[in-house]
Amino acid sequence: MTMKISVWSLLIVIGYHLWMSPVLAGPLNFGYLSWGQHSILEQDSVQLISHQSLLPAGDNLISLHKSLVEIESLGGNEVNVSDFLKSYLESKGLTVELQRVSSNPTVRDNVYAYLGSQRNTKVVLTSHIDTVNPFLPYYIEGDKIHGRGSCDAKSSVAAQIFAMLELMSEGKVQEGDLSLLFVVGEEIDGIGMKTVANKLNADWEVAIFGEPTENKLGVGHKGNFRFDVYAHGKACHSGYPQEGFSAIEFLLRQCVKLMDTDLPKSKLLGPSTINIGTIEGGAAANILAAEAKAEVFIRVAEDIETIRDIAEDLFDTEHSEIKVIQYSPPQYLDYDIPGMDTVVLAYATDIPYLSDRKMKIYLFGPGSIREAHGPNEYVTFSQLFEGLNGYKRMVMYNLR
């Protein structure tokens, strides 16, 4: 297995670098792509499936993914990738709308693309174009494509785009069948998808969300309850603590009580988990802290209302208050496509912002969440092509 994968990786890397080599006057003139290579790991072998494509040589999934990853799009600064996608998708004959999310301090736009003039479609492929900090440059190492967003979630964006382009070239989708939606702000507060829910005025029967699921169908994922706690004390000399009140000590004690609380569990999603992400405050070691702050993130498996009540009992007091940053319940998803593996996920997505709509919702995408957000984020070549195949399969299943 190791030898077969390494040979495949070598062929892909050599082919890609020959294709994009600056030594050449331009892309190799192979006419039209005959290496729309989609690799599928089947049992103990790597099988190459070649799709004859109507897309010009040099215009392929790997080069689109490279372009996306090379554009820095940290949360709050996504305008360059939005503009790139608008130009790219228009060049493929799609109608493209930029939905303004905010203009201050920077322009932030969602991207919505479809065939012809029919804005409402049966299926929408959607993902997010923002990434976490810090930006990491694009590079290839063996069969791995590194860079910030290479996995989460520009692999999904690229694979979804090529799924639509290939289905168009194969004559399998018509106006009103399929659209693309790429949003900003997923990694921070979901502002992009919230704006879609409130203002886009487009309807779908099926939404396929793109996130790293190792190309498995998500059965469900945990919810988010994220909040900040502000504690208030009275500063005094630490030699006379009875004269004051330490905001830090109070905050720590309340956080320990939260950590010791048995939060609601789910048979499917497992336990709710708590992370005290940051604690800050105080002026010096010899002064009782007058102010303190903690950032808390609870991954909610069940009964988010009860968990919120617990947090408010602990932190909405005469000495402190909470500010809710994110509040979204656990999600239970559609996974009815025969022959596709499934997975339960501990992270959260933008799905809750559309969950009140009467439509089917799927979660699927290339890459592993374990490789996302870290200093060595990557997706493999085979994962990208498998993701492309998976999106096409899901679209066609729901258009049948």
From Swiss-Prot:
InterPro entries: Bact_exopeptidase_dim_dom, Peptidase_M20, Peptidase_M20_dimer, Peptidase_M20A. Zn(2+) 2 binds at residue 152. It is found in: Secreted. Glycans are attached at residue 80. One of its GO terms (biological process) is glutathione catabolic process. GO terms for molecular function: metal ion binding; metallopeptidase activity. Zn(2+) 1 binds at residues 152, 187. The active site is at residue 186. Keywords: Glycoprotein, Hydrolase, Metal-binding, Protease, Secreted, Signal, Zinc. Binds 2 Zn(2+) ions per subunit. GO terms for cellular component: extracellular region. Coiled coil: none annotated. Its cofactor is Zn(2+). Residues 1-25 form the signal peptide. It comes from the Eukaryota. Belongs to the peptidase M20A family. This is Peptidase M20 domain-containing protein C757.05c.
